[in-house]
């Protein structure tokens, strides 16, 4: 591992990075929230099906 080379590449990435605008942030947050809700809904559906199947928990 070449520490000086790694540090310079990290610094280069940090200089190129910028703070997202409010519009970008809200879009990403909305998509992430919808993804979390979708995964939770799929889990609930699987749990509901397994509850009614004989031999389920």
Curated annotation (Swiss-Prot):
It comes from the Archaea. SUPFAM superfamilies: Preprotein translocase SecE subunit. It is found in: Cell membrane. The keyword Transmembrane helix applies. It is a single-pass membrane protein. Keywords: Cell membrane, Membrane, Protein transport, Translocation, Transmembrane, Transmembrane helix, Transport. GO terms for biological process: intracellular protein transmembrane transport; protein secretion; protein targeting. One of its GO terms (molecular function) is protein transmembrane transporter activity. InterPro entries: Prot_translocase_SecE_dom_sf (IPR023391), Translocase_Sec61-g (IPR008158), Translocase_SecE/Sec61-g (IPR001901). GO terms for cellular component: plasma membrane. The keyword Cell inner membrane does not apply. The chain crosses the membrane at residues 33-53. Essential subunit of the Sec protein translocation channel SecYEG. Clamps together the 2 halves of SecY. May contact the channel plug during translocation. NCBIfam families: PRK09400.1-6, secE_euk_arch. Component of the Sec protein translocase complex. Heterotrimer consisting of SecY (alpha), SecG (beta) and SecE (gamma) subunits. The heterotrimers can form oligomers, although 1 heterotrimer is thought to be able to translocate proteins. Interacts with the ribosome. May interact with SecDF, and other proteins may be involved. Belongs to the SecE/SEC61-gamma family. This is Protein translocase subunit SecE. The lineage of its organism: Archaea, Methanobacteriati, Methanobacteriota, Stenosarchaea group, Halobacteria. The gene is secE.
């Amino acid at each position: 591992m070449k520490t000086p080379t790694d540090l310079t590449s990290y610094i280069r990435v940090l200089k190129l990075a910028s703070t997202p605008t409010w519009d970008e942030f809200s879009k990403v947050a909305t998509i992430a929230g919808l993804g979390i809700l979708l995964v939770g809904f799929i889990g609930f559906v699987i749990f509901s099906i397994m509850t009614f199947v004989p031999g389920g928990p």
